[in-house]
Amino acid sequence: RSFFMKKMGLGKRVLACAVSAASLLTGTTALSAVAQLSASAASTDNYAKLLQYSMYFYDANMCGDQVENAGQMTWRGNCHTNDAVKGGFHDAGDHVKFGLPAGYTASTLGWGYYEFKDSYDALGQTSHLRTITDYFAQYFKDCTTLSNGTVTNFVYQIGNADQDHAEWCAPEDQSDASRQVYQTSNGASDIAAGYAAALAVNYINFGNAEDLSYAKALYEFSIKYNKTAEDGIGEFYKSYDYYDDQAWAAGWLYLATKDNTYKTFLNTFMNASNQGKSGSSGC
């Protein structure tokens, strides 16, 4: 914990993550004190149930041909089974699988578990959390084509947002024709780094060596090309900077490997991001 607070506390990504993780922080740290609260001090608040229910959001947005097996919502079924890359999660009420929020969300969920593992274990929520983060991780790996350990192609989005937003229905009822695929062999550095971060923290938490291998490869891909994703993004998740994502991923890769190269990347990209430098056109 101190590593990130000291090394990344000034970065905009960590500030955003701190806000996102606040519900986990509040819920888990308050749990030990709940039994001691007086009746006049909101004794009806149940932070354990809040944590449990908050994760149902991901079950509700699960996508692919394993929803019925992996998800905990009995009213959800398999969907979009003809996607070029199955799995993953829908974004925000629509059914697009956007890359930028997916990587950010998965890494933040992993961070919550990394910080408060004992609370998840005590509340019996570790298995559910792992199902969600593993589902993210498998999708990220399936989006990535490797050749001798090097990324040669990377899918960063499934679905055309404008087309998707013109159709309002349950995901199971949406036309299951193969949806538009957005991929690159030399870009989307912001999203590749986000996936790398999520895979690295999932390796730290649960020890799947394949997650770490893909995390390293995606990170090398990200810093090799240094271009943000543009095609298909529109104004939904438009990004002008990849340094914050690269710093965030470097921190987790350092914790996963103890390789000082990643610590150097962390400092370099964190400083670049804080100084407002951008690797692509725009402000």
Where are these regions (language model features)?
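Sec-dependent N-terminal signal peptides
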Residues: 10-28
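Low-complexity, Ser/Thr/Pro/Gly-enriched N-terminal "stalk/linker" regions
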Residues: 38-100, 104, 134-183
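Well-ordered alpha-helical scaffold segments within catalytic/enzyme domains
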Residues: 56-64, 106-123, 138-146, 194-208, ...
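Short, Lys/Arg-enriched N-terminal segments with co-localized hydrophobic residues
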Residues: 1-4
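Short, surface-exposed loop/turn segments at secondary-structure junctions
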Residues: 45, 92, 118-130, 209, ...
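Long, well-ordered core segments of solenoidal/helical folds
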Residues: 54-66, 78-80, 132-148, 214-230, ...
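Active-site lining segments of carbohydrate-active enzymes
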Residues: 153-241, 247-255, 266-283
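Sec-dependent signal peptide cleavage junction
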Residues: 25-43
